[in-house]
Curated annotation (Swiss-Prot):
Site (Reactive bond for host factor Xa (F10)): R34, A35
Function text: Salivary anticoagulant that targets host coagulation factor Xa (F10). Blocks activity of host prothrombinase (F10-F5). Inhibits factor Xa-mediated acute inflammation in the host. Inhibits other host proteases involved in blood coagulation and inflammation: cathepsin G (CTSG), kallikrein, trypsin, alpha-chymotrypsin, beta-tryptase, plasmin (PLG), elastase, proteinase 3 (PRTN3) and coagulation factor XIa (F11). Inhibits lipopolysaccharide-induced procoagulant effect in human endothelial cells. Inhibits Xa-mediated cleavage of protease-activated receptor 2 (PAR-2/F2RL1) in the host.
Species assigned in the record: Simulium guianense
Single Gene Ontology MF annotation: toxin activity
Coiled-coil ranges (or none): none
Source species taxonomy: Eukaryota, Metazoa, Ecdysozoa, Arthropoda, Hexapoda
Disulfide bonds: C24-C74, C33-C57, C49-C70
Annotated signal peptide: 1-19
Domain BPTI/Kunitz inhibitor: 24-74
Subcellular location: Secreted
Stated name of the protein: Guianensin
Description of how the protein assembles with itself and partners: Monomer. Interacts with mouse, bovine and human coagulation factor X (F10) (activated). Interacts with human coagulation factor XI (F11) (activated). Interacts with human coagulation factor IX (F9) (activated). Interacts with host plasmin (PLG). Interacts with host kallikrein.
Length: 106
């Protein structure tokens, strides 16, 4: 009984993982309703996340609330760096501080 339960859970997780990977290849579908929710979908032709207006019902799983969520799910082997423009902080000796970010792609 325990083995059957463990196997069932494993198969559900495996199926979810396989289905999850196909989300990014689905076409954009704005749904049947007429709401205007700003969403993002992954365009597999251009390999970018693009904005669209979701109607609020139906549609498909290629529908993300943020561009970052879309990118995290669908960009393969790419670094996602979001930067903000800030005024540089000055140290006491009036030298501007600088920051460096290193991203490991492996």
């Amino acid at each position: 009984m325990k083995i059957a339960l463990i196997c069932s859970v494993f198969l559900v997780c495996l199926a979810y993982t396989w289905a999850d990977e196909d989300v990014c290849s689905l076409p954009m579908n704005d749904g049947l309703c007429r709401a205007l929710h700003k969403r993002y979908y992954y365009d597999s032709a251009t390999k970018t996340c693009k904005m669209f207006y979701y109607g609020g019902c139906a549609g498909n799983a290629n529908n993300f609330e943020t561009k970052r969520a879309c990118a995290e799910k669908c960009y393969k082997n790419k670094a996602l760096i979001k930067t903000r423009k800030r005024k540089p902080k000055k140290k006491k000796n009036n030298k501007e501080s600088s920051e460096m970010t290193i991203i490991n792609m492996d």
